Amino acid sequence: EMCIRDRGMNFVVSYQTTRPADTRIHLYDVGCSYRLGGWFFEAEYLRKEYARNSFAGVNAFDGFFCYDLPLRRVFKKMSFAGRYDYMSDHSNGIPDDNGLLFVNDLERHRVTAGITFSFGLPFMADIRLNYEMYFYDKGVVPKVSEHDKIVLEFMAHF
């Protein structure tokens, strides 16, 4: 991983490899983030290649923005966030009974909007409420967990 930081801007380029079964998978990643006052922006592109052309390469993109509004009472800040992410058809690298890789995760687009309330010390925790909207090609039947939904999370930082 290579990281360059300058005046609120952060660039990251990385490479990873994994071999969940018989096929080596290479992941190439480039990302950029920028902080300006209470605003934070981030974009990332990932390319996933499977050895021996055993599965079509995967493209993934993520764009994110957030605005932090300082608070003075129970919560330290309230953050408003939006995100867009995309991933083309994807395989986890584990072959079927015929030894071939197959689509485990269908191509999708997702838009997320949410609000987070952050506690200050001594708790270091967040309460987040998001709405996630998924977009698929016609005729695609997504997994139960990947339909439009409202998500409420409680996160503790250690």
Can you annotate each of these PLM segments?
Residues 2-4:
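Short, small-residue-biased leader/transition segments that mark boundaries at the very start
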Residues 8-158:
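Outer-membrane beta-barrel pore domains
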